[in-house]
Regions:
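Short beta-strand-to-loop element that shapes/binds the nucleotide-sugar donor at the catalytic cleft/hinge
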Residues: 119-140
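Short, flexible, basic/aromatic active-site loop/helix in glycosyltransferases
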Residues: 142-165
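Glycine-rich, basic loop-to-helix element that forms the pyrophosphate-binding segment
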Residues: 67-84
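Acidic donor-binding segment of Leloir-type glycosyltransferases
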Residues: 23-66
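C-terminal catalytic/acceptor-binding lobe
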Residues: 20, 192, 196-258
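Acidic donor-binding/catalytic loop of UDP-sugar-dependent glycosyltransferases
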Residues: 96-109
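N-proximal low-complexity "stem/linker" segments adjacent to membrane-targeting elements
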Residues: 1-25
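Short aromatic/hydrophobic "clamp" motif used to bind/position activated sugar donors
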Residues: 89
Length: 258
């Protein structure tokens, strides 16, 4: 049994050709083995493709939600979780990148925290959102330098490549599979990509974590991650990602047209 199942939801369209490129890149660069498996889950796609064969040829799992009429990230995540062989899940959106070095750290933390048996244990990843220039400039460097390059740009506040920093990614969390399913997974009533991860993350925090102090007015949405006071649900969500920061574990979100 692998230590971790990584669920990657996607759906293709002619308007967003970069999605197919990013799925191909992930299927090619990731390696499913005895420690980690990658599950690519396709929701609704309006573009024909041959990704299934490519994904399976690279020894990953491919699933298709044939019932989707419009794309749903949440339904894809739930489907991937139900087919996962590991007792530990990580959800990775196609626009997001985690280095192989950080995957190794995550696997170690999964064992140290015993997440496969401890249903309340979590790893929440901080995410650095990159600007358009970073998409091309990073390719000029060996991939093993990407972590240091981006983190140096973030820490020095040069922001050559960094668009903004979110201390907590509400979509990419490492969680016990039983706990994910027990909490009902993502609400499948959400369509497209939106607040389905906020809804689920709030349920996770209430079930798994005790807080000495809660922010005021939880229903308030600051619409960004720059906090000057402890107010709103984003300030609550942000608390969990700093642990991974201390380990040097960051996730990076590549730019795309919104």
């Amino acid at each position: 049994m692998p230590l971790l199942s990584v669920v990657i939801p996607f759906g293709l369209s002619k308007e967003r050709s970069y999605i197919e490129e990013r799925v191909l890149q992930k299927a090619k660069s990731f390696q499913s083995d005895e420690n980690i498996e990658f599950i690519f889950v396709e929701g609704y796609s309006s573009k024909d493709h041959e990704l299934k064969n490519f994904i399976q040829a690279n020894h990953h799992i491919y699933l298709k939600d044939i019932n989707q009429k419009v794309f749903s990230q949440g339904r894809c995540r739930n489907l991937g979780a139900s087919y996962a062989h590991s007792n530990v899940l990580l959800f990775l959106d196609v626009d997001c990148y985690i280095s192989l070095n950080n995957f190794e750290k995550i696997l170690k933390l999964i064992q140290i925290k015993n997440i496969s048996q401890n249903i309340n244990a979590l790893i929440v990843l901080p995410v650095v959102y990159l600007n358009k220039e970073a998409n091309e400039k990073l390719k000029q460097y060996d991939e093993k330098f990407w972590d240091i390059l981006i983190q140096e740009d973030l820490f020095t506040a040069k922001n050559t490549w960094v668009k903004f920093f979110a201390p907590s990614s509400t979509s990419s969390i490492v969680i016990n599979k039983y706990q994910f399913l027990r909490l009902g997974g993502n609400d499948e009533n959400f369509i497209g990509h939106g607040y389905e991860d906020f809804d689920f993350f709030a349920r996770v925090l209430k079930a798994c974590v005790s807080f000495e102090k809660m922010p005021t007015n939880l229903s308030y949405d600051a619409r960004n991650w720059n906090f000057f006071n402890f107010k709103g649900f984003r300030s609550w969500f942000s608390l969990l990602g700093y642990e991974a920061c201390f380990y040097g574990i960051y996730m990076y979100h590549f730019y795309h047209i919104e």
